Amino acid sequence: MGNELLIIEDNAQNFYMMKFLLEKNGFSIIGTENGRDGIKAALEHTPRAILLDIQLPEMDGYEVAAALKTHKEMADIPIIAVTSYAMAGDRENILAAGATGYIEKPINPETFVDEIRQYLP
Amino acid sequence: MNRFCSIFRKNVFFISILLLWMTLIPSFFCGTAHARIVKIGIYENAPKVFTDASGKPAGIFVDVIEYVSKKQGWQIRYVTGTWAEGLDRVTSGEIDLMPDVAPSPERKKHYSYHQVPVLSSWFQVYAPKGSGIKSILDLNGKKIAVLDRSIQKEAFEELKQGFEMNSTLITVPDYTTLFKITRDKEVDAAITNRFYGLQYAKDFDLEDTAVIFHPSNLFFAAAVGTRQDLLNAIDTHLASLKKDPDSVYYQSLKTWTAEKVKFTLPLWIQMLGLLIMVFLIAALAGSAILRKQVTVRTRQLENVNHTLQTSEKKYRELVTLANSIILRWSVDGRILFLNDFGLQFFGYTEPEIIGKQMTDTIVPEMESTGRNLNKIIRDIPDRFKAYEQHINENIRRNGDRVWIDWRNRLIVDDKGLPKEILSIGSDITPLKQAEQKINQLNRDLQQHAQNLEKQVQDRTAELTVAMEKAQAADHLKSAFLATMSHELRTPLNSIIGFTGILLQGLAGPLNEEQQKQLGMVQNSSRHLLALINDVLDISKIEAGQLSLSFSCFDLRDSIEKTVHLVQPLAQKKALELLVEIDETVSEVTTDQRRLEQIIINLLNNAVKFTEQGHIRVVCRPEKDHYLLAVEDTGIGIHPDEISGLFQPFHQIDTGLSRKREGTGLGLSICKKLIQMMNGRIDVRSQEGKGSTFTLCLPKNCEVSHGK
């Protein structure tokens, strides 16, 4: 299994920031700007983990997580929600939708990579 | 009558005794030689001569002889017997004088008389009532009783012979026997002198017949040729006695008989006179009685009349002066009477209104309420009971409408048909006006109440709308804040992320100045993040969207962890950070993250507002809760500030000059969170000396929280 991570994130700066940080720590990054492409990429590449933003155009994070979980080959791939949603129940809702982990934005660049590693199989 | 007589007889007896005594006294003193004893015969022929009830001689002859004896100084001795015995005694010389003797040719041979008669008398026939004897001829064939040897006997025998009548004469010894046998019908009639007859006929139920005959004079008689001195003396005194109307003689006549001494008058005139007298007296007495009765009756009537007048006056005054309207009206609605008060009240004079229809004067056709009063007035006599008390509108002459409370009484005629109505009325216009005013006020009040109710409803509706709007706005605000929070975090994520990357040297080495400036960017972005978090928290709490997640954890660990987090800041300001946790402090069930948020907030504030001294964290259990105090020796809080301390966006030294960092939301979030945990936060502070914030935290907030 490679060291490939899929980041589904519509904000270019955030994507770049995370990609930079993770690549500096030895990960290779695939990115998509929307859920549909994200699902396609996930099925195509079967990444080690998927970093999923919640607020996305067309399909939101919940739908994406739910869709991914319908694919057998996606069953063991952790989905880590990285989101700026901080309202009550957000964490519970996304975990219920099929996410493995939850990281609140803004991220702490000093601890972010360690947090991701924590969810990897 | 008898009783009357006997009283007189008694009196006469005493007078006689007195006279006797008076006649005796002089003779006694003058010597017995002059005292001549005169014996007088007595027989029963009242009232002329008789023996009274006490056995003493009495009568007119006795009175006369007593008077003469007294004058002459004689001493009288009476010898009682029958008429015949008396006559015999005179002739035999046994007595000196026999009274009541009528001279006749035959008697003249045996008796001597004086000249002046003592009495004159008539004979009369008496018979039982209804005898039918009207004239002397009716006595033919009848049995007639007569006194033995009397002059009546002689006279009647002469009449009998003259009229050739065949009547049987029965002689009796005295008058009493005479009347008795006549009453007992042993004889048909009796002849007697009128003196006796008048007095006693009634006692024997006899009536006097029209047969009157033989007038005769009566004298004292002596034996022929003897006692001439006595007879002369009698004549002398009788002559003088008869001249004086007040003499003993007339008094005696008056005493013994009702008959007047007008002997010269014919008997029928005397009788007539007597009858007229009796009639007159009876008439006078009757008229007096009648007059008296009339007077009494008149007085009674006057009294009754006076009482009636007084009473009537009283009632008239009552009616005319009463302070009520008193009205009488006929069944066809005409006014028959109206008292003064009523006249004055309605503004009419009596001639103006009496006889007029009520509807033309004091009653309006239509009441202001719309009732037809004309119809009601026509209705009253027929359906009277319904109108015994009736309130209606009336009208004064000047057109003023008034309200009268009428009490009506129906007056019926002899046949029981309605005749007139008596109405007594009181003016209740002010009452009615007050009532109307009250009704109006009531209506106003009701209207007002309805208005108020409507206002309240409107206002409630408005408030509901406003509240819904507010709630909607609240939701909107929350949604806005959530969105804003998200939208702010996204760029902040890049800022914080890249700053961290740069500071870590991941993008290449930094010089000292770059390092310093990027550090400032990092601080600012962290502060901005804290601000965003706090705003989000408060908005979540206020929108009721913040929910706690409870777990059981060790309180000591949480406290120590938070103290550890704040330690670097305290050290930087050279403040001593003391922790005193009681040995018994252990598990607590509450929202750990939020509790730690509170403790960090309090510790951060303590460090922030303290320049020197120490910060002390004390925790100990008390009953079912823990007390956790954060104490500092900082600037303290002015008493005026304490009340607003827990309000959102509050910070001491507000304004541009503030030197403390912070959002001003911390304490208000703390208070709201601790309240959600069923706990409490209190503050005690002395300005310039320090503050103590104390949390009261239930050991298990789930027990009472219910979540």
Question: Predicted segment positions?
Answer:
Chain A
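Conserved acidic carboxylate
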Residues: 9
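Charged docking surfaces used in two-component/phosphorelay signaling
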Residues: 16-24
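Short hydrophobic/Thr-rich beta-strand motif most characteristic of the beta2 strand and flanking loop
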Residues: 26-33, 41, 103
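Active-site beta3 strand of CheY-like receiver
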Residues: 45-51, 56
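The feature encodes the CheY-like receiver
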Residues: 57, 66, 75, 87, ...
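C-terminal output helix
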Residues: 107-116
